[in-house]
């Protein structure tokens, strides 16, 4: 469940550099997947993200 700086996992989501202690990012856009991020929250177990980005 912990995120590291080099592609650790956060729950179901594979992460790059994380936003916050355990927040995934959107890969193509590089912005946070979360309530405050432009991509919106991550949805579903395959890392799809609301807003057209991917985690």
From Swiss-Prot:
Keyword Repeat: yes
Origin: domain of life: Eukaryota
UniProtKB keywords: Developmental protein, Differentiation, Repeat, Spermatogenesis
A Gene Ontology biological process term: spermatogenesis
Expressed in which tissues: Testis.
Domain notes from UniProt: This protein is mostly composed of repetitive C-G-P motifs.
Membership in a protein family: Belongs to the MST(3)CGP family.
Protein name as catalogued: Male-specific sperm protein Mst84Dc
């Amino acid at each position: 469940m912990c995120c590291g700086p080099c592609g650790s996992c956060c729950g179901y989501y594979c992460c790059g550099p994380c936003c916050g202690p355990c927040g995934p990012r959107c890969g193509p856009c590089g912005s946070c997947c979360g309530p405050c991020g432009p991509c919106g929250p991550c949805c579903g177990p395959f890392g799809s993200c609301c807003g057209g980005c991917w985690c």
